[in-house]
């Protein structure tokens, strides 16, 4: 079992002061093996904070990030899954299923994690999985002014990925669970 925290679109300090205290109390060091971030941290202090939770931190650049060293997209393998990471402002139209599926094919990944819309989504599409963890701070976007803070915790175990979405609604943390299974690859003999 490998725990992967997926979050993004924090926009600190421009659109939000910090992560919600209820989220901060849940995100403790030593529990999570990987963090993947869809960008728009905006300041180095958020990067440093995430490193205290887990040193294995993968970040892609959002259009408001100060650190130009973050790549546009990134792929990594966790367990049996190949994950792709992209902020999403490059995908036109934003959040479009077919455009995201094309990016997923281009990256050759089982799970594509993208952001930019600030709205949580997770679905199977064209044989893959697309996840948007939303905005971890509830920062507004050009699409939506009223955003519930959210993040995703993935439990990857073999060919199974359980996606838990944590969303702060009316001051309470609500958790939903979605399970995805990757069919095992079979090799055919000569």
From Swiss-Prot:
Superkingdom of origin: Eukaryota
Record key words, sorted: Auxin signaling pathway, Cytoplasm, Endosome, Golgi apparatus, Membrane, Protein transport, Transport
Predominant place of localization: cytoplasm
SUPFAM superfamilies the UniProt entry points to: Metallo-dependent phosphatases
Gene3D superfamilies: 3.60.21.10
Gene deletion effect: Dwarf phenotype with several auxin-related defects. Reduced primary root length and fewer secondary roots. Abnormal cotyledon shape, number and positioning. Accumulation of storage proteins globulin 12S and albumin 2S in dry seeds.
Bilayer topology term: Peripheral membrane protein
Assigned protein family: Belongs to the VPS29 family.
PANTHER family: VACUOLAR SORTING PROTEIN VPS29
Function in brief: Plays a role in vesicular protein sorting. Component of the membrane-associated retromer complex which is essential in endosome-to-Golgi retrograde transport. Required for the auxin-carrier protein PIN2 sorting to the lytic vacuolar pathway and the PIN1 recycling to the plasma membrane, thus influencing auxin transport orientation. Also involved in the efficient sorting of seed storage proteins globulin 12S and albumin 2S. The VPS29-VPS26-VPS35 subcomplex may be involved in recycling of specific cargos from endosome to the plasma membrane.
Name by which UniProt lists this protein: Vacuolar protein sorting-associated protein 29
Origin species: Arabidopsis thaliana
């Amino acid at each position: 079992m490998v725990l992967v925290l997926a979050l993004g679109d924090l926009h600190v300090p421009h659109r939000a002061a910090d992560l919600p205290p209820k989220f901060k109390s849940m995100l403790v060091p030593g529990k999570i093996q990987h963090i993947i971030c869809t960008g728009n941290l905006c300041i180095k202090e958020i990067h440093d904070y995430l490193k205290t939770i887990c040193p294995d931190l993968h970040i892609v650049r959002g259009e408001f990030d100060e650190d130009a060293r973050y790549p546009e997209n990134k792929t990594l393998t966790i367990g049996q899954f190949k994950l792709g990471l992209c902020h999403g402002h490059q995908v036109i139209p934003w959040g479009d299923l077919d455009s995201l599926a094309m990016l997923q094919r281009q990256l050759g990944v089982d799970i594509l994690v993208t952001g930019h819309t600030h709205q949580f989504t997770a679905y199977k599409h064209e044989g893959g999985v697309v996840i948007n963890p939303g905005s971890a701070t509830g920062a507004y976007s050009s699409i939506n002014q009223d955003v519930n803070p959210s993040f995703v915790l993935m439990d990857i175990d073999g060919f199974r990925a359980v996606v838990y979405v944590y969303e702060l609604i009316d001051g309470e943390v609500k958790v939903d669970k979605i399970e995805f299974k990757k069919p095992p690859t079979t090799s055919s003999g000569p």
